[in-house]
Design a protein with these regions (language model features):
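Extended, intrinsically disordered, low-complexity segments
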Residues: 194-230
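Glycine-rich beta-strand-to-loop/alpha-helix junction loops that act as flexible
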Residues: 157-161
């Protein structure tokens, strides 16, 4: 975005336009207010207005202001009331994190802000889960989903590193519309680079790496039950 007048964004948008299936170009975790406004002048379909690094009050106020601006530019918006950061050892007990979980009041406030997609915290973390594994509060998710959908807002899930396939499908059944998958998509790519860098031509390394990403993406489309829906 910051270089060559957004050339990479324009390239991605053109590729999406020429695709044989519907594809949107999304800007994730945009935490700079000026960058959000800049993104509105580029061919993004949606922008995550991520003000979660501010206090809860500032997050809501800034989100509401930026969501309004994005909508005047025809951009869909995503936001998160707060986030739980995982570490190398993960999260020991979600009971200690009750103050960081998304509350029903916050859901209603963000729905009222005009946001299109909401990424709540109900036990999911950004980062590692640690030896205890994933511990989600399903009742909280159910009520969050009820409040959000009543206001026409869709639920997004962040923090799905190494989720079992059956858990991901259970989340889809629970009403999650969009699932952000990053690390799991790239692991085979990283492994391919580590095993082959310096051993094969650079162009071959990249081409085969892209194939690894495509294979991982196809697998996750199957897991999320989105394959064949275009």
């Amino acid at each position: 975005m910051a270089y060559s007048n957004g050339l990479l964004v324009h390239t991605a948008a053109q590729a999406a336009k020429e695709a044989t299936v519907p594809i949107s170009v999304h800007l994730d975790h945009c935490q700079d207010e000026n960058m959000v406004r800049r993104a509105c002048d580029l061919p993004f379909d949606s922008i995550m207005v991520d003000m979660s690094h501010h206090s809860k009050e500032q997050n809501l106020a800034k989100t509401q202001e930026l969501v309004s601006y994005c909508h005047t530019k025809g951009k869909a918006t995503e936001a998160e009331p707060g986030r739980i950061e995982g570490g190398e050892d993960g999260i020991s007990d979600t009971a200690d994190l009750s103050g960081l979980m998304t509350t029903y009041e916050e859901v209603q406030q963000f729905v009222d802000s005009g946001v299109d997609f909401l990424a709540p915290a109900f036990g999911n973390v950004h980062g590692e889960y640690g030896p205890r594994g994933v511990v989600l509060e399903w009742d909280r998710l159910a009520e969050i989903h009820n409040i959000a959908t009543a206001g026409g807002v869709l639920i997004v899930l962040h923090g799905v590193n190494r989720f079992p396939q059956d858990l991901t499908r259970k989340l889809v059944a629970a009403g999650v519309t969009k699932i952000n998958v990053n690390r799991d998509i790239l692991m085979d790519y990283y492994r391919h680079l580590e095993q082959n860098v310096g051993k094969i031509p650079f162009t071959q390394l990249l081409e085969e790496g892209v194939e690894k990403v495509a294979e991982s993406m196809a697998l996750h489309m199957d897991i999320c039950l989105s394959s064949g829906k275009a």
